[in-house]
Swiss-Prot record:
NCBIfam families: PRK13505.1. One of its GO terms (biological process) is tetrahydrofolate interconversion. This is Formate--tetrahydrofolate ligase. The gene is fhs. It holds the Pfam family FTHFS. Belongs to the formate--tetrahydrofolate ligase family. It is an enzyme of class 6 (ligase). InterPro entries: Formate_THF_ligase, Formate_THF_ligase_CS, P-loop_NTPase. CDD domains: FTHFS. Keywords: ATP-binding, Ligase, Nucleotide-binding, One-carbon metabolism.
Amino acid sequence: MKTDIEIAQSIELKPIVDVVEKLGISYDDLELYGKYKAKLSFDKIRAVESNPVGKLILVTAINPTPAGEGKSTLTIGLADALNKIGKKTMIAIREPSLGPVMGIKGGAAGGGYAQVLPMEDINLHFTGDMHAITTANNALSALIDNHLHQGNELGIDQRRILWKRVVDLNDRALRHVTVGLGGPLNGIPREDGFDITVASEIMAILCLATDIEDLKRRLANIVIGYRYDRTPVSVGDLQVEGALALILKDAIKPNLVQTIYGTPAFVHGGPFANIAHGCNSVLATTTALHLADYTVTEAGFGADLGAEKFLDIKTPNLPTSPDAVVIVATLRALKMNGGVAKDALTEENVEAVRAGFANLKRHVENIRKFGIPAVVAINEFVSDTEAEIAALKELCALIDVPVELASVWADGVEGGVELAETVVKTIAENPANYKRLYDNDLSVQEKIEKIVTEIYRGSKVNFEKKAQTQIAQVVQNGWDKLPICMAKTQYSFSDNPNALGAPENFEITIRELVPKLGAGFIVALTGDVMTMPGLPKRPAALNMDVESDGTVLGLF
């Protein structure tokens, strides 16, 4: 089997103008970035707003192994297969962060014969959106420090500045830094730090904004810190939301590319799901819904994180809710959740599959709580055995959830046809009746407790003293009616990454609350979730190179 990049480089791409023609998009509607990438103009986005709204399919997963379970691959393969069976389909997914690409992932544009192309560009600098977000974020940092240096008219307490700088890399050395050193000419010394770009609130804002005016409104609402009297300071107080929106004026437009089989795809925005809401842009998803009969999108990590946030935070900003949720499961992840060590996941172990099924079952139950039908997709690996597959299908039948084997990684579009047919049938026979998990009018504590007890199945929430103080501050400032965005490990329902499977009777500790008023939610931090990742012992970057003719090597 060829590597992902070898497969990608063997495909003859169509000009993006030709790919999107079937959607009613013309050359004049596009802002081209070479022959194979483009942004869609705002004029076209506005023109299609009166079109009917298509069906929405959300792809999520069980709690993953560190390598991931092929959610993006299944999303792409399912969309290709839907087109294959005659359904006019688009994809709306996130764009990769360069840090994890150079770190552990090595690429994040699908895999095998289910990829979005040109994968080298998508995984590297693409259309420059990440750089625009990084620049806007750091421009705000520079403007804050300049305000301090020039007399601090707003009375900002430099000890209570929340806003951090960002870079689109995994760089643990930058987590805690001191800026403003070197004497009076170099500013006011203060503690600072760097997050990875996809953890920036500006990324979340870009993915939730509906147009330039909404973007400016959200940017103005960002809380950058507090004054000496403990009152909040916003970007609007600094009067720089216009400048930040100017930096982002092109980044807000959705990017268009294609799959190996010519399915049009929006690849736009990419907040992490363990520290932000983990979904691609509202603008891309909404536009896809107006252009196609079926839109396939995804939410980061497992359904306890990405899907819950998609349904509680993103869906209220969309013209429709998901008609079906596809839960991606792999036998290796089920075995890991069933107690098998990482180095033994390729060995047949039917009992571990049965034990790990408790994890999948809980995710299915959770999706049904939102009133949406679920379909299980088994992402096939070469190490899977017939006995393991049969056991999983038998267990799915016991809870009356449709299940299909998908081999889109190895077999491309043909490997997803049965899944596509099952999803279409499920949507036709089981109309969704979407309902949110909680009402925003509940208190902050009640909303967090609802997520912990209903989705994670924990028994209790503990609030550290710092979090209790911050809840009082949130209430005092009138922010308590915002939804909650949980920051939690992706590997477990609990806040302990080692508690795999379907743990019960556990307690979750909230250590900190961070207001993200621009994004429109409150982040509740649990455990040791990092907003700036580090590199592994052997980064994927060690295998990367470029030849003299520009051919990229080592992405996978």
